[in-house]
């Protein structure tokens, strides 16, 4: 769950930087948040599939 929290933190940084006019920081933070979110999503889907197939009792 920590990875998702980091993604949300970088999203908030991106929004605040965008509001304040720091477009370079905003774009970089948005890219980091997007990458972390997709990593979290892939890990979640892999564990979901493993939980439904291999680790079934």
From Swiss-Prot:
<protein>
    <recommendedName>
        <fullName>UPF0391 membrane protein BRADO2787</fullName>
    </recommendedName>
</protein>
<feature type="transmembrane region" description="Helical">
    <location>
        <begin position="6"/>
        <end position="26"/>
    </location>
</feature>
<dbReference type="GO" id="GO:0005886">
    <property type="term" value="C:plasma membrane"/>
</dbReference>
<keyword id="KW-1133">Transmembrane helix</keyword>
<keyword id="KW-0812">Transmembrane</keyword>
<comment type="similarity">
    <text>Belongs to the UPF0391 family.</text>
</comment>
<keyword id="KW-1003">Cell membrane</keyword>
<dbReference type="InterPro" id="IPR009760">
    <property type="entry name" value="DUF1328"/>
</dbReference>
<feature type="transmembrane region" description="Helical">
    <location>
        <begin position="35"/>
        <end position="55"/>
    </location>
</feature>
<dbReference type="Pfam" id="PF07043">
    <property type="entry name" value="DUF1328"/>
</dbReference>
<keyword id="KW-0472">Membrane</keyword>
């Amino acid at each position: 769950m920590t990875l998702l929290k980091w993604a949300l933190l970088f999203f908030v940084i991106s929004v605040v930087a965008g509001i304040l006019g720091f477009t370079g920081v905003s774009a970089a933070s948005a890219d980091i948040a997007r990458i972390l979110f997709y990593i979290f999503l892939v890990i979640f889907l892999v564990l979901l599939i493993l939980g439904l197939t291999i680790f079934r009792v």
